[in-house]
Amino acid sequence: MNWITNYVRPKINSMLGRREVPENLWIKCPETGEMVFHRDLEENKWVIPQSGHHMKMPARARLKDLFDGGIYETLPQPKVAQDPLKFRDSKKYLDRLRDSRAKTELEDTIVAGLGLVQGVKLVAVVHEFNFIGGSLGMAAGEAIIRAFEKAIAEKCPLVMFPASGGARMQEGILSLMQLPRTTVAVNLLKEAGLPYIVVLTNPTTGGVTASYAMLGDIHLAEPGAEIGFAGKRVIEQTLREKLPDGFQTSEYLLEHGMVDMVVKRHDLPATLARVLKILMKKPVEAARRESGSQVSALPVAARA
């Protein structure tokens, strides 16, 4: 009896018992409820196959997907004061930083790289939304400024991929200072005669929208991205009016002239290369031949 109890029964229980399944093994589409295996989602650039819904894409995955062959030079993360205000809400700010670093394996929300996109050299700056909501603080602001300086030194364009809830409240006025600082960096790039492209991703809101996210020479946006300053619910409560359907989406902004193009994630590298070749004054026919696309598909502002 002991042999059955101590050996056979545990074996049967282990074979038939419920197995632990990682929580992130299957990912649910927020639009249709479709369940997608995480590896399939990663291979499809974090786009739901059936619905076409664009999920949030990790910063490093975006850089690897963007640059030719996934090869790029990672720009160093500048060091700044960690918690000068000694801020605490329901949790210490230092604890939030520690948890976000463990979750994302990043020092802060900004990841920047230098590489080639279909032969065009550029600096790309990407927000990691999973790091405290992609919020803009001192470290992020300094990283963005260094990226603009790198682009100027390399005499190449800069492409920004914002995904943020806005300024980081745990840093107070020190966070808000990054709005004018990054705006100055944008102006320096433009004074150098170099293009600045913004690819608006979901979500782009708050102070990030009020600064460098809306200062591009060309604004692209991913489908269905939420783009705005204040949230839709806050605006409705303030105005006491119901807002139009699709308000603050990339498609709505395209219709009202705030966005130049809505581009699917799979088409972004080719579109960026085509736009940049034109802005860098490369012959139009050469740009058309290399991209294999019709330059006439660009908006009038981009062709001017």
From Swiss-Prot:
Pfam families reported for this sequence:
Carboxyl_trans
Record's InterPro entries? AcCoA_carboxyl_beta, Acetyl_CoA_COase_Trfase_b_su, ClpP/crotonase-like_dom_sf, COA_CT_N
Q: Which cell locations does it reside in?
A: Cytoplasm
Spell out the reaction equation it catalyses: N(6)-carboxybiotinyl-L-lysyl-[protein] + acetyl-CoA = N(6)-biotinyl-L-lysyl-[protein] + malonyl-CoA
What are the EC numbers? 2.1.3.15
Pathway(s) annotated for this protein in UniProt: Lipid metabolism; malonyl-CoA biosynthesis; malonyl-CoA from acetyl-CoA: step 1/1
Residue ranges occupied by any CoA carboxyltransferase N-terminal domain in the UniProt entry: 25-294
Instruction: Kindly give the Gene3D superfamilies that the UniProt entry links to this protein.
Output: 2-enoyl-CoA Hydratase, Chain A, domain 1
Mind telling me which GO cellular component terms the entry cites? acetate CoA-transferase complex
The domain of life is: Bacteria
GO MF term (any one): acetyl-CoA carboxylase activity
Tell me the protein's name: Acetyl-coenzyme A carboxylase carboxyl transferase subunit beta
